[in-house]
Amino acid sequence: MDLFTIFAMKLLTYNDFFDSVSSALTSWTGKLQGLGIAVIIFCVCIIAFMFMFGEGPSRTAKKWLLYIVVGGVLLWGAGTFASTVQGVTAGF
């Protein structure tokens, strides 16, 4: 075997594509969850002020609250999905 073949075999054994993708997904969703919690808290504070200021802003606040809850569920669902994919593919 020549040097290039040995290098290619070592590269393929240490840098499996699926391991790289699953670890990147886990890393990204972890960072998004950290940022997401700050954004969710900020938006909930804005919604609280909107509820205090009367009828019109209160209707808008109810819509925003639904969007924030759905967004939070999607954000944490993506993190859980990435962890599940990483756990399932770890055996292969």
Curated annotation (Swiss-Prot):
Transmembrane annotation, as ranges: 34-54, 65-85
> Is Plastid one of the keywords?
no
Sorted alphabetically, which InterPro entries does this protein's record hold?
TrbC/VirB2
Coiled-coil positions are none
Report the subcellular localization: Cell membrane
**Record-level GO cellular component terms:** plasma membrane
State the annotated membrane topology for this chain.
Multi-pass membrane protein
Q: Which UniProt key words apply to this protein?
A: Cell membrane, Membrane, Plasmid, Transmembrane, Transmembrane helix
Keyword Zinc-finger among UniProt keywords: no
Grouped into one coarse class, the protein's main location is: membrane
Put simply, this protein is called Uncharacterized protein pXO2-18/BXB0017/GBAA_pXO2_0017
Source organism per UniProt: Bacillus anthracis
